[in-house]
Regions:
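Structural motif
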Residues: 14-19, 49, 164-168
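Alpha-helical scaffolding within the catalytic cores
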Residues: 2-5, 32, 149-153
Length: 174
């Protein structure tokens, strides 16, 4: 966060917000750095949110987030639902972005208690679902069944002149 406060965003094209704790990331950034990130993207730069980073990018009522991706996390009371290899399938737009995976029926990525997204109907940001979660993860924390499957796995959207990519899982760890 000190780097952001010291204008590191002026020297990069994209920022990656990794996994961890979306709430901690939100609090550590503080209001000024949150706005700096939003302004950075709006001016034409990019942002990638992975797991907790995707939580941070969401527009989830009563949750610490910076409203960048048009998604709402649901069932956050069971965010410790479990982890492992998760199945996903690419949508048509996702096949264009990930051409090396386009011919696969199903792909796998490490999932570790990431958000369960739905489009936030109150948000003006229009996001594109690039992939759909096919796994039903609910082995821990009394998480209900049939909550994760069929939900957005990768989403992308414009934000001002920039682009935002959100992943509920950990492609960097796969």
């Amino acid at each position: 966060t000190a780097d952001i406060a010291n204008n590191v965003l002026d020297s990069i094209d994209a920022i990656i917000i990794p996994g961890g704790s979306g709430k901690s990331q939100y609090l550590n950034l503080g209001t000024l750095n949150q706005q700096r990130i939003k302004d950075f993207i709006a001016k034409g730069k990019g942002a990638v949110g992975i797991c907790a980073g995707a939580y941070l990018f969401s527009n989830t009522p009563d949750y610490t987030c910076i409203q960048l991706n048009g998604q709402q996390a649901i069932d956050i009371e069971h965010d410790n639902r479990g982890h492992g290899l998760a199945k996903f399938t690419l949508c048509e737009e996702g096949k264009k972005i990930f051409p090396k995976l386009a011919d696969r029926d199903t792909s796998f990525v490490i999932y570790y208690e990431g958000p369960v997204f739905i489009n936030n109907p109150a948000d003006t940001i229009q996001s594109n679902t690039l992939a759909i979660m096919e796994s039903d993860v609910h082995e821990e924390g009394n998480a209900p069944a049939n909550m994760t499957n069929g939900k957005p796995f990768f989403v992308a959207n414009n934000y001002g002149k920039g682009r935002v990519f959100s992943s509920i899982a950990h492609p960097e760890g796969t």
